[in-house]
Amino acid sequence: MNFQVFSLIFFNFVYYCSCSTFEEALCELEKEERVKVLRCYEENTDPGILLYSKSFLSCLLDERASFITLNEMACGKTFSTNERRACFEEANVFLVNFTEEMKKKHKNAVKKCFDK
């Protein structure tokens, strides 16, 4: 695995699964506001990111549910080393196709949905 792919895996793992700025910001919101922000994100980003994040969170949470439900469940959840390792492997498949355009849409969606 090259460094760039590893960095992307690490970034996305931190983003979705640990105490990252985005997760902390989401989890600090009231539930109604959090759902509103996540719906905004869904409307303003690439569907590929949502499919990946749903799959990635589903892997960690062992739950097949909506993007919003999975993010709700992820707030406050601690993941074991084995869970993280398994999801690193799953993430690798997606990240090969994580294009610059998708990264830009993701960044813009986060900015638009939080900066209100």
UniProtKB/Swiss-Prot annotation:
It is found in: Secreted. It comes from the Eukaryota. Keywords: Disulfide bond, Secreted, Signal. Contains 3 disulfide bonds. GO terms for cellular component: extracellular region. Expressed by the venom gland. Residues 1-19 form the signal peptide. This is Venom protein 54.1. It comes from Lychas mucronatus (Chinese swimming scorpion).
